Amino acid sequence: MLPPAIHLSLIPLLCILMKNCLAFKNDATEILYSHVVKPVSAHPSSNSTLNQARNGGRHFSSTGLDRNSRVQVGCRELRSTKYISDGQCTSISPLKELVCAGECLPLPVLPNWIGGGYGTKYWSRRSSQEWRCVNDKTRTQRIQLQCQDGSTRTYKITVVTACKCKRYTRQHNESSHNFESVSPAKPAQHHRERKRASKSSKHSLS
């Protein structure tokens, strides 16, 4: 058994130890809660973050979508070799010309693509049907035709040398808009003719 004087001296020590223990517990809980709260305040949850997860982490900025969806586009070019004839005269040597096909494709898909091309534009998958391959550059070439009687003729013809992609709107492909705009005007003319007929009948009766 300890003497009473020692008991009295141990009471302040116990009080100090209890205060330190409480302070340690409070510090631990504050650190724990601060660790949980900070990520929530730094990165608030919103609809955009949820949509990013659904869309594979893509952002909704228009520039980002345009850069990812646009690629260079070019025409599918075909080389043709043919002879020019006019009656009984035929060209001595075959004529080689470029034929522009009716579709535009991304450059990596085109045959003989080596990383560049003339007249390249940007192509979007959504608007692939609106692009058409048309003639871009032409030149005049002279050819000689050999006739059956031994005479020769010289002709000037236009040869395509380059193609380009041209974008067409829906109005270019749909010709029905012109007819629809003209058809509503016809009933108005009939209505005016009826008014004139009714007026003439009134004058005749009077």
From Swiss-Prot:
Residue ranges with Basic residues bias: 188-206
Signal peptide (residue range): 1-23
Biased composition annotated in UniProt, kind: Polar residues: 43-62
Record Gene3D superfamilies: Cystine-knot cytokines
Glycosylation (residues): 47, 173
Induction comment: Up-regulated at day 5 pregnant or pseudopregnant of the uterine glandular epithelial cells, at time of maximal sensitization for the decidual cell reaction. Down-regulated at day 6 refractory uterus.
GO molecular function term, any single one: BMP receptor activity
Pfam families on file: Sclerostin
Residue span, CTCK domain: 75-170
Region annotated Disordered, chain positions: 42-62, 176-206
InterPro entries found in the cross-reference section: Cys_knot_C, Cystine-knot_cytokine, Sclerostin/SOSTDC1
A single Gene Ontology CC term: extracellular space
Localization (cell): Secreted
Tissue specificity note: Highly expressed within the maximally sensitized/receptive endometrium. Weakly expressed in brain, kidney and the female reproductive tract. Expressed in the dermal papilla (DP) and at high level in the precortex of both anagen vibrissae and pelage follicles. Dynymic expression during the hair cycle.
Disulfide-bonded cysteines: 75-133, 89-147, 100-163, 104-165
Primary localisation category: secreted
Subunit field text: Interacts with BMP2, BMP4, BMP6 and BMP7 with high affinity.
Function summary: Directly antagonizes activity of BMP2, BMP4, BMP6 and BMP7 in a dose-dependent manner. May be involved in the onset of endometrial receptivity for implantation/sensitization for the decidual cell reaction. Enhances Wnt signaling and inhibits TGF-beta signaling.
Family: Belongs to the sclerostin family.
Name recorded for this polypeptide: Sclerostin domain-containing protein 1
Species of provenance: Rattus norvegicus (Rat)
